[in-house]
UniProtKB/Swiss-Prot annotation:
One of its GO terms (molecular function) is nucleic acid binding. Residues 5-154 form the RNase H type-1 domain. The keyword Cytoplasm applies. It catalyses: Endonucleolytic cleavage to 5'-phosphomonoester. This is Ribonuclease H. It is found in: Cytoplasm. Belongs to the RNase H family.
Length: 175
């Protein structure tokens, strides 16, 4: 897929951990199908994350996994995140980590390897491009996914479908 060609799906994802590490945490995502008027969004509260501590980075990665869940194999997806960690881990660092047996440049084990490998596997089923957006800088859809993640972490009701649609319109993602 050429770099300037929009993917069929556009996904925004964000994660939050109220105490980092320790949680509770939350994830939020919005997915738009550009080929037809379809929208999916959601949020999940995480009190525990298996044997791992709930951290902001784990919630950021989980939010992307939730956004990619259920998308048809082979489709192109543009994922937008305000986490440099997510964008760099999945588009840059992962190649070196694989070559080094899942070790960092410092020789340490890669943190969150389980989620990164899950995203890598899902990314191989899809055609995923990652891009970064500055967080808390007024991007309407990023603000909505942040609110979804924060609300989920607190166990509160998050933005409504009307709020999500309003943000998508404000960002000129939909008409």
């Amino acid at each position: 897929m050429p770099a300037d060609t929009p993917a069929r799906y556009l996904a925004f994802a964000d994660g939050s951990s109220l105490s980092n590490p320790g949680g509770p945490g939350g994830t939020g995502f919005v997915v738009v199908d550009r080929a037809r008027p379809a929208l999916r969004f959601g949020a999940t509260r995480w009190v525990t994350d298996g044997t791992y501590a709930v951290t902001n980075n784990r919630m950021e990665l989980r939010a992307v996994l939730e956004a990619l869940d259920g998308l048809p194999e082979g489709e192109a997806v543009d994922v937008v995140s305000d986490s440099r960690y997510v964008v760099d881990a999945l588009s840059k660092w992962i190649h070196g980590w694989r070559k080094k047996g899942w070790r960092t440049a410092a020789g340490e084990p890669v943190l969150n390897r389980d989620l990164i490998e899950a995203l890598d596997a899902r990314g191989r089923e899809l055609r995923v491009r990652y891009s970064w957006v500055r967080g808390h800088d007024g991007h309407p859809v990023n603000e909505v996914v942040d609110a979804l993640a924060q609300s989920a972490a607190r166990g509160a009701t998050g933005p409504s479908e009307a709020n999500v649609i309003e943000a998508l319109r404000a960002a000129a993602v939909i008409g």
